[in-house]
């Protein structure tokens, strides 16, 4: 494939945008390449400015569960835009979307909308601190919860790609209140509690980690985490910005028996529009302004266009829950095919699937935490990514990112993807 126009566009962007992109992972630094500049999407496909077509397994990093330009979502957005882009005032569509979310998540009585997943998590952390009167929070190495200061400590996602344990500009006085546990290791959590006599406001976790690759939390680990939080009066937050409505209709909470105290959401609930949300029981949410003393606000929170897109998306999912069986079967078919391709050239690979989310590592052992994920062959992944891209397969440009299946992806497209994997790995191994 030719990428001449994208290369030129990247050079132009670099002159006026830091790194040429508005989110670091998009720069393709993790795979030592140049990002295709996308012109449009249609169904399962992306089209770049050079005229190349790709089967898209990134799905705008998760939101597009129905693929690009879904007719129903597109119609709801157009209808909403005709009424106005933003009002900075309450609308009934906010309430309707909130009602759908509350119905689907037992742990949520009330929900508030914001404009991004980062905002959702930042606000949830503030609410947890306000509700408990404690400063310390606990997160897990490799879990990414957006780029708010308190949580840029040994995060995954782009920070893993760039090998940065935290970010300059984040005060040490702030991060001293962020404690670190090891994912799927309850002893590390017990030690954090033992070392914090002043208490911990909240424990935040991706119940299905998606930013150190796809790494689900063990059920026993989540149960032990729930028990520890209960024993210490600590709020348990599930960050389901990625897994919400992706792992199942009820997110990770449709798979695990463990129920959190608070939940953060994003991605699918906006169907590709900028949105985030956080919710909890009525008593906790009553601490939030204007009812309570914990302040949170946003000019574009509950934007009517985003709400309309999200409402249509969730109602489509709710009307046909069998979609998740279909998506899960396709995800399994894909990773099984990738594994066969790797086996054919004696390349070790481990895979996992949770609903419409999938992941793979070039590794010879199961991945249970960030340290395991870091042992995957990143150089091989970079070569594999380039070969797949050249064959029209658009995968996440980091071995630490999760892939996604949309309803627009067909069995024939998966067969084409697996064929490309065979060709790419055979080419790499010579």
UniProtKB/Swiss-Prot annotation:
Sites bearing N6-(pyridoxal phosphate)lysine, chain numbering: 267
The keyword Isomerase appears for this protein: yes
EC class name: isomerase
GO molecular function list: glutamate-1-semialdehyde 2,1-aminomutase activity; pyridoxal phosphate binding; transaminase activity
InterPro entries attached to this UniProt entry: 4pyrrol_synth_GluAld_NH2Trfase (IPR004639), Aminotrans_3 (IPR005814), Aminotrans_3_PPA_site (IPR049704), PyrdxlP-dep_Trfase (IPR015424), PyrdxlP-dep_Trfase_major (IPR015421), PyrdxlP-dep_Trfase_small (IPR015422)
SUPFAM superfamilies the UniProt entry points to: PLP-dependent transferases
Pathway this chain belongs to: Porphyrin-containing compound metabolism; protoporphyrin-IX biosynthesis; 5-aminolevulinate from L-glutamyl-tRNA(Glu): step 2/2
Localization in the cell: Cytoplasm
The keyword rRNA-binding is assigned to this record: no
Cofactor(s) needed for function: pyridoxal 5'-phosphate
PROSITE patterns: AA_TRANSFER_CLASS_3
UniProt EC number: 5.4.3.8
UniProt-listed GO biological process terms: protoporphyrinogen IX biosynthetic process
The reaction(s) this protein catalyses: (S)-4-amino-5-oxopentanoate = 5-aminolevulinate
One GO CC term, this protein: cytoplasm
Pfam families reported in the protein's UniProt record: Aminotran_3 (PF00202)
UniProt keyword annotations, A-Z: Cytoplasm, Isomerase, Porphyrin biosynthesis, Pyridoxal phosphate
Gene3D superfamilies the record matches: Aspartate Aminotransferase, domain 1, Type I PLP-dependent aspartate aminotransferase-like (Major domain)
Family: Belongs to the class-III pyridoxal-phosphate-dependent aminotransferase family. HemL subfamily.
Alphabetical list of HAMAP family matching this protein: HemL_aminotrans_3
Quaternary structure (record): Homodimer.
Protein name: Glutamate-1-semialdehyde 2,1-aminomutase
Species, as recorded: Sulfurovum sp. (strain NBC37-1)
Encoding gene (name): hemL
């Amino acid at each position: 494939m030719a990428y001449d126009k994208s290369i030129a566009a990247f050079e132009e962007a670099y002159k006026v945008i830091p790194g040429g992109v508005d989110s670091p992972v998009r720069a393709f630094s993790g795979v030592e390449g140049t990002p295709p500049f996308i012109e449009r999407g249609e169904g399962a496909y992306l089209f770049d400015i050079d005229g190349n077509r790709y089967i898209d397994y990134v799905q705008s990093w998760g939101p597009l569960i129905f693929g690009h330009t879904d007719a129903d979502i597109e119609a709801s957005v157009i209808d909403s835009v005709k009424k106005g882009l933003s009002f900075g005032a309450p609308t009934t569509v906010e309430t309707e979307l909130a009602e759908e979310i509350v119905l689907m998540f037992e742990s949520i009585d009330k929900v508030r909308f914001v404009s991004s997943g980062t905002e959702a998590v930042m606000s949830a952390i503030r609410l947890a601190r306000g509700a408990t009167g404690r400063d310390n929070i606990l997160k897990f190495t490799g879990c990414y919860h957006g780029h708010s200061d308190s949580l840029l400590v040994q995060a995954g996602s782009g920070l893993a790609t760039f090998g940065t344990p935290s970010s300059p500009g984040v005060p040490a006085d702030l991060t001293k209140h962020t404690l670190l546990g090891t994912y799927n290791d309850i002893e590390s959590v017990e030690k954090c509690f033992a070392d914090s006599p002043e208490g911990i406001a909240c424990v935040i976790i991706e119940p299905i980690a998606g930013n150190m690759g796809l790494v689900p939390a063990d059920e026993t680990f989540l149960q032990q985490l729930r028990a520890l939080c209960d024993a210490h009066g600590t709020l348990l937050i599930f960050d389901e910005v990625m897994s919400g409505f992706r792992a199942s209709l009820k997110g990770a909470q449709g798979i695990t028996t463990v129920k959190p105290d608070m939940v953060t959401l994003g991605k699918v609930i906006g169907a590709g529009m900028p949105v985030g949300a956080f919710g909890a029981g009525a008593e906790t949410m009553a601490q939030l302004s204007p009812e309570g003393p914990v302040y949170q606000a946003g000019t574009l929170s509950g934007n009517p266009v985003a709400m309309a897109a999200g409402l249509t998306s969730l109602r489509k999912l709710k009307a046909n829950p069998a979609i998740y069986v279909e998506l899960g079967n396709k995800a399994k078919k894909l990773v099984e095919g990738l594994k066969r391709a790797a086996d054919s050239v004696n390349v070790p690979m481990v895979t996992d699937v949770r609903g419409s989310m999938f992941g793979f590592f070039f590794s010879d052992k199961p991945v249970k935490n960030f340290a395991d994920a870091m042992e995957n062959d990143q150089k091989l992944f970079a070569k594999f990514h380039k070969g797949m891209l050249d064959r029209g397969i658009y995968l996440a440009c980091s071995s630490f990112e999760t892939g996604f299946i949309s309803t627009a992806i067909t069995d024939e497209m998966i067969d084409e993807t697996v064929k490309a994997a065979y060709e790419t790995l055979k080419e790499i191994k010579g």
